[in-house]
Amino acid sequence: MQLLTFCSFKGGAGKTTALMGLCAALANDGKRVALFDADENRPLTRWRENALQSSTWDPRCEVYSADEMPLLEAAYENAELEGFDYALADTRGGSSELNNTIIASSNLLLIPTMLTPLDIDEALSTYRYVIELMLSENLAIPTAVLRQRVPVGRLTTSQRRMSEMLESLPVVPSPMHERDAFSAMKERGMLHLTLLNMGTDPTMRLIERNLRIAMEEVVVISKLISKILEA
């Protein structure tokens, strides 16, 4: 089982949204995915509840509460016993013993960020923290920045400057763009199943097209992440 962790010191950086998108891509590819809800607000648990109500939850995926150390340990053990292909961890903001344990146990670390000065500053702080933690523990875990909510059109001067600041870091080549399909995942449920349901309704063709573009985007990101894991 490969553990992929989404981490950021800043709340609202897009950790949960990025995780949901990647989860949909992996499940759509037939992978079994465990989700570790380590944020005390338990957004993944609420996501699952909403998805079940909308019949957009994939049974190949399961959410485990992991916002305390005993829960995390039990979640990891159970997920391995169940034979999941991947575990995706949604961490809480800031540093903590729990976050450190998740980071140190990971096969890949993803640091989501939007292209604002505050977000980039927090992403850089998170990256430095992760590197220092790995050095102190004598670990070498692949780490990459994932750009979030990138405008579909032209970037502003400020956004271009922020993007250039990331060039010295490992960055997932393809970003997640700012799309309604992504922002609505928490309410609608899993992206690939929402798309499947929309495809049967001829009156929803425009929304279906937007969902399809978003799905294609996370599939590309999923393949890029798989290459990082295989390296």
Curated annotation (Swiss-Prot):
Entry annotated with the keyword Electron transport: no
InterPro entries, A to Z: DNA_Partitioning_ATPase (IPR050678), P-loop_NTPase (IPR027417), VirC1 (IPR009744)
Keywords: Crown gall tumor, Plasmid
Superkingdom assignment: Bacteria
Listed Pfam families: VirC1
Matching CDD domains: ParAB_family
Other observations noted: The Ti plasmid contains at least six transcriptional units, designated vir loci, which are essential for efficient crown-gall tumorigenesis. The translation of virC1 and virC2 may be coupled.
Record-linked PANTHER family: COBQ_COBB_MIND_PARA NUCLEOTIDE BINDING DOMAIN-CONTAINING PROTEIN, P-LOOP CONTAINING NUCLEOSIDE TRIPHOSPHATE HYDROLASE
Name of the protein in question: Protein virC1
UniProt organism field: Rhizobium radiobacter (Agrobacterium tumefaciens)
Name of the gene: virC1
